[in-house]
C-alpha cells in the first residue's frame, strides 16, 4: 500500500477522511485517474458537479507551473484533464465569488468596489437568481462547505437562503484556521463558523482545511449517486493568517523565507484535502459521472508568501498577476483530455456552463455576462468569449494623472478600470502595485520583500498591452497605438452605461459580535428599510465572555498588518 504523505493512515481514519475498507488496495489509488479508477461506463445524466475554490493561491503556486511547492494531486488532476491557461478571475475575494454565483460582472451587481466587510449592511443582491438556485430547479442537491464572504447582515443573505441545502463554513472573509475568530478592528472580534444558520461552537479547534474536506467527504458518503449533486468547496486556504499543521511545515524546513514556508505548507495540506475528496468521489460511486472544477479566486498575496511569477502584480491589482487564475477541469466526461486550453474564459462563464451541463436553460432575460464554454473545455472548440470587463470602480477615481481629456473626451482615465478585448488589454486609473515579484524563498526581515525587477514610479493613467504577445505586461503600447486605446476606452464607456449604482454602505455598529452572543451573524430584521442601515443603535443583549484577550489583540494586529500590505483590501 502506498505511503500517504503528510497524513498517517491512523490520522486519516481518526479525522474521518477514510473508512477502514478504504485501506484495502482495491480502493487506495496512486492518484486520480490511476490505479483503482473505476472502469468507464455510459454515464447517467446530468453529471455531479464538484467546484473547488481556493483563496489567494498565486499563479505560480502549483506544481505544474514550476513551483517549489508540492501539489501532486492538483498536478495529476490537471494533467489528466484540461488546464485552463487563458482563464480570468477577479483581483479580490467578494467580486470573484459574486461573479461565480451570479454569472454577472460587478457593475451589474453593485459590488464594483472593494469587498463586503463584516460590519456592512450589504450582501449579494437578493433579486438575482444564484447558480445553486438554478441547479436546484434542475433537480440538484446543493451543498456548500467553506468561505462565503458574500454578506450576512440579514438571514435572507445566508447561503442556505441563496440556494444551498446545507452549509458549513465562515461568513466573513478572514478567520483563524483553528479558533475561527475574526477581528474587524480594535475590540470588534467574534467567532465565525456556522453550520446551516447556527453557530458551530463545538467544531472550534479543528484545522479548517481538514474540517472542510471531512465534511465534503461526509456529504458524498451520505448522498445517493443517483441524484445529481452540486458540491461547492470554498477552502479558506491559503488566505492569511498563515497557519498550518506542523507536519506540513516540516517538509519545507529548508525554505528560508518564513512566510513562504508557512504558505507552502498550507498549499500542500490543501492539495491533500483535494485528494481525499477525490477518493471519496470514487469510493461512493460519483467519480465516473462527475465534473471536477478547480479555480483560484484571485492572485496570490506576494507579501504573505504567495507568488504569481512571472506575471506582473499581485492580489488586489488589475495586472495579470491579480486577475489571471489557476484553473482546470477534470472529468471522465471530457471528450478531449490531457491537454491545455488557451480559450478565453472568465469566472462568470461557470454559471451558464454549469446550468447547461445540468440540463437547465438560461436566456437573455437572465442578464448574464458569462458564456457557456463547455464545448471549448470538453471538445477544444473556440471560446464564444472575445472580451472581458475586469471592472470599473467609480469610487476609486483619484489617479493623480488621469482626466477626461487624457481619455480623448471618451473616458475619465482617473477612474480605475480594466478591460480585455481580443488580444488587447487596457488599464486606466491606478491598477495597483505593478512589480514583478519572484517567489519569496530567501530569508528576509519581517515585513520586507525583494524584487528581481522594480518599476519606477510613472506618471500615467493609461496602459495598453498585447496580452497574447506580452503576457507579462512589459511593453506598454498606449503611446504607439492610440487607435486601439480609443476603441477600448469607448468600450469601457459602453459598459459603464449599463452599470448599476455601487452598493458600499457605511459600517453598522449593530453588527458587533458582542450584540450577537459573541459570533458574527445576521443582525438586521427582514423588514428594515435600507435608510436605517448604517444607523448606530445600542443593544442590551448578553455578551460572550472574552476567553483570550491577548489572542484577540494578536489577531487584530495580524489583520491590521495584512490590510496595510494589501492596500485597500
UniProtKB/Swiss-Prot annotation:
The active site is at 93 (nucleophile), 149. Its EC number is 3.1.6.-. Keywords: Calcium, Endoplasmic reticulum, Glycoprotein, Hydrolase, Metal-binding, Oxidation, Secreted, Signal. Substrate binds at residues 147, 239, 315. It comes from Homo sapiens. The oxidation of Cys-93 residue to 3-oxoalanine (also known as C(alpha)-formylglycine) by SUMF1/Sulfatase-modifying factor 1, seems critical for catalytic activity. Gene3D superfamilies: 3.30.1120.10, Alkaline Phosphatase, subunit A. The keyword Repeat does not apply. Glycans are attached at residues 276, 288, 466, 496. Belongs to the sulfatase family. Residues 1-23 form the signal peptide. Pfam families: Sulfatase (PF00884). Binds 1 Ca(2+) ion per subunit. This is Arylsulfatase I. Displays arylsulfatase activity at neutral pH, when co-expressed with SUMF1; arylsulfatase activity is measured in the secretion medium of retinal cell line, but no activity is recorded when measured in cell extracts. Lacks arylsulfatase activity. Ca(2+) binds at residues 55-56, 93, 297-298. The keyword Protein transport does not apply. GO terms for molecular function: arylsulfatase activity; metal ion binding. The gene is ARSI.
Amino acid at each position: 500500500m502506498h505511503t500517504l504523505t503528510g497524513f498517517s493512515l491512523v490520522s486519516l481514519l481518526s479525522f474521518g477522511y477514510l473508512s477502514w475498507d478504504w485501506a484495502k488496495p482495491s480502493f487506495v489509488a496512486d492518484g486520480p485517474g490511476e490505479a483503482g479508477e473505476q472502469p468507464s461506463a455510459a454515464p447517467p445524466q446530468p453529471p455531479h458537479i464538484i467546484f473547488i475554490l481556493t483563496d489567494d493561491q498565486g499563479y505560480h503556486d502549483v506544481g505544474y507551473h514550476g513551483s517549489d511547492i508540492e501539489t501532486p494531486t492538483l498536478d495529476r488532476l490537471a494533467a489528466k484533464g484540461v488546464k485552463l491557461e487563458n482563464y480570468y478571475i477577479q483581483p479580490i475575494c467578494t467580486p470573484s465569488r459574486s461573479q461565480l454565483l451570479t454569472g454577472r460582472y460587478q457593475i451589474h451587481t453593485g459590488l464594483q468596489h472593494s469587498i463586503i466587510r463584516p460590519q456592512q449592511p450589504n450582501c449579494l443582491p437578493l433579486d438575482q437568481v444564484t447558480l445553486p438556485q438554478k441547479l436546484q430547479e434542475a433537480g440538484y442537491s446543493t451543498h456548500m462547505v467553506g468561505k462565503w464572504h458574500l454578506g450576512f447582515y440579514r438571514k435572507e443573505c445566508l447561503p442556505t437562503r441563496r440556494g444551498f441545502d446545507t452549509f458549513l463554513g465562515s461568513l466573513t472573509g478572514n478567520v483563524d484556521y483553528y479558533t475561527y475568530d475574526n477581528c474587524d478592528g480594535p475590540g470588534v472580534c467574534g467567532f465565525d463558523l456556522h453550520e446551516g444558520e447556527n453557530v458551530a461552537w463545538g467544531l472550534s479547534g479543528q484545522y479548517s482545511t481538514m474540517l472542510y474536506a471531512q465534511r465534503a467527504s461526509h456529504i458524498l458518503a451520505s448522498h445517493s449517486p443517483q441524484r445529481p449533486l452540486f458540491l461547492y468547496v470554498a477552502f479558506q486556504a491559503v488566505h492569511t493568517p498563515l497557519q498550518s499543521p506542523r507536519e506540513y511545515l516540516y517538509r519545507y524546513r529548508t525554505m528560508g523565507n518564513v512566510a513562504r514556508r508557512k504558505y507552502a505548507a498550507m498549499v500542500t495540506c490543501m492539495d491533500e484535502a483535494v485528494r481525499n475528496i477525490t477518493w471519496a468521489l470514487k469510493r461512493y460511486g460519483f467519480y465516473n459521472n462527475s465534473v471536477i472544477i478547480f479555480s483560484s479566486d484571485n492572485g496570490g498575496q506576494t507579501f504573505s508568501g504567495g507568488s504569481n511569477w512571472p506575471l506582473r502584480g499581485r492580489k488586489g491589482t488589475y495586472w495579470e498577476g491579480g486577475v489571471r487564475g489557476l484553473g482546470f477541469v477534470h472529468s471522465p466526461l471530457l471528450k478531449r483530455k490531457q491537454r491545455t486550453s488557451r480559450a478565453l474564459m472568465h469566472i462568470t462563464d461557470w454559471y451558464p456552463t454549469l446550468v447547461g451541463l445540468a440540463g437547465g436553460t438560461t436566456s437573455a432575460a437572465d442578464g448574464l455576462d458569462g458564456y457557456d464554454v463547455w464545448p471549448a473545455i470538453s471538445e477544444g472548440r473556440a471560446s464564444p468569449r472575445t472580451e472581458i470587463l475586469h471592472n470599473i470602480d467609480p469610487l476609486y477615481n483619484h489617479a493623480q494623472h488621469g482626466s477626461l481629456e487624457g481619455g480623448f473626451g471618451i473616458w475619465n482615465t482617473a477612474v480605475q478600470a480594466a478591460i480585455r478585448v481580443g488580444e488587447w488589454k487596457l488599464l486606466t486609473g491606478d491598477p495597483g502595485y505593478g512589480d514583478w515579484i519572484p517567489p519569496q524563498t530567501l530569508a528576509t526581515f519581517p515585513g520586507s520583500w525583494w524584487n528581481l525587477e522594480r518599476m519606477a514610479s510613472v506618471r500615467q493613467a493609461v496602459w495598453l498591452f498585447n496580452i497574447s504577445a506580452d503576457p507579462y505586461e512589459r511593453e506598454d503600447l498606449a503611446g504607439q497605438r492610440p487607435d486601439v486605446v480609443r476603441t477600448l476606452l469607448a468600450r469601457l464607456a459602453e459598459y459603464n452605461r449599463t452599470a448599476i449604482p455601487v452598493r458600499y454602505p457605511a459600517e453598522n455598529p449593530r453588527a458587533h459580535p458582542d450584540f450577537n452572543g459573541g459570533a458574527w451573524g445576521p443582525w438586521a430584521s427582514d423588514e428594515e428599510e435600507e435608510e436605517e442601515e448604517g444607523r448606530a443603535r445600542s443593544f442590551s443583549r448578553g455578551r460572550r465572555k472574552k476567553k483570550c484577550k491577548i489572542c484577540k489583540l494578536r489577531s487584530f494586529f495580524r489583520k491590521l498588518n495584512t490590510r496595510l500590505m494589501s492596500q485597500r483590501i
